[in-house]
């Protein structure tokens, strides 16, 4: 319930644009957000391991 209310609160606009912040589209997490994917780092990692993100693969060097 608390997480849902945070997502709804973030969806509303603030008076000042600098106060707006992005949340993960899957889990609602505010930290570790990647704008390119629109998700947090944890959801990106999970989807990449499952093969749900085309063109993304684990790096090794």
UniProtKB/Swiss-Prot annotation:
<dbReference type="GO" id="GO:0015935">
    <property type="term" value="C:small ribosomal subunit"/>
</dbReference>
<dbReference type="InterPro" id="IPR043140">
    <property type="entry name" value="Ribosomal_uS14_sf"/>
</dbReference>
<feature type="binding site">
    <location>
        <position position="27"/>
    </location>
    <ligand>
        <name>Zn(2+)</name>
    </ligand>
</feature>
<feature type="binding site">
    <location>
        <position position="24"/>
    </location>
    <ligand>
        <name>Zn(2+)</name>
    </ligand>
</feature>
<keyword id="KW-0862">Zinc</keyword>
<comment type="similarity">
    <text>Belongs to the universal ribosomal protein uS14 family. Zinc-binding uS14 subfamily.</text>
</comment>
<keyword id="KW-0694">RNA-binding</keyword>
<dbReference type="GO" id="GO:0019843">
    <property type="term" value="F:rRNA binding"/>
</dbReference>
<keyword id="KW-0689">Ribosomal protein</keyword>
<keyword id="KW-0687">Ribonucleoprotein</keyword>
<dbReference type="InterPro" id="IPR023053">
    <property type="entry name" value="Ribosomal_uS14_bact"/>
</dbReference>
<dbReference type="GO" id="GO:0006412">
    <property type="term" value="P:translation"/>
</dbReference>
<dbReference type="InterPro" id="IPR001209">
    <property type="entry name" value="Ribosomal_uS14"/>
</dbReference>
<dbReference type="GO" id="GO:0008270">
    <property type="term" value="F:zinc ion binding"/>
</dbReference>
<keyword id="KW-0479">Metal-binding</keyword>
<keyword id="KW-0699">rRNA-binding</keyword>
<feature type="binding site">
    <location>
        <position position="40"/>
    </location>
    <ligand>
        <name>Zn(2+)</name>
    </ligand>
</feature>
<protein>
    <recommendedName>
        <fullName>Small ribosomal subunit protein uS14</fullName>
    </recommendedName>
</protein>
<dbReference type="GO" id="GO:0005737">
    <property type="term" value="C:cytoplasm"/>
</dbReference>
<dbReference type="Pfam" id="PF00253">
    <property type="entry name" value="Ribosomal_S14"/>
</dbReference>
<comment type="function">
    <text>Binds 16S rRNA, required for the assembly of 30S particles and may also be responsible for determining the conformation of the 16S rRNA at the A site.</text>
</comment>
<comment type="subunit">
    <text>Part of the 30S ribosomal subunit. Contacts proteins S3 and S10.</text>
</comment>
<dbReference type="GO" id="GO:0003735">
    <property type="term" value="F:structural constituent of ribosome"/>
</dbReference>
<dbReference type="InterPro" id="IPR018271">
    <property type="entry name" value="Ribosomal_uS14_CS"/>
</dbReference>
<feature type="binding site">
    <location>
        <position position="43"/>
    </location>
    <ligand>
        <name>Zn(2+)</name>
    </ligand>
</feature>
């Amino acid at each position: 319930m608390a997480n849902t209310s945070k997502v709804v609160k973030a969806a509303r606009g603030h008076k000042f644009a600098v106060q707006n912040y992005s949340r993960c589209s899957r889990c609602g997490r505010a930290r570790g957000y990647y704008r390119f994917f629109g998700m947090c780092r944890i959801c990106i990692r999970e989807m990449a391991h499952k093969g749900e993100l085309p063109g993304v693969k684990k790096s090794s060097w």
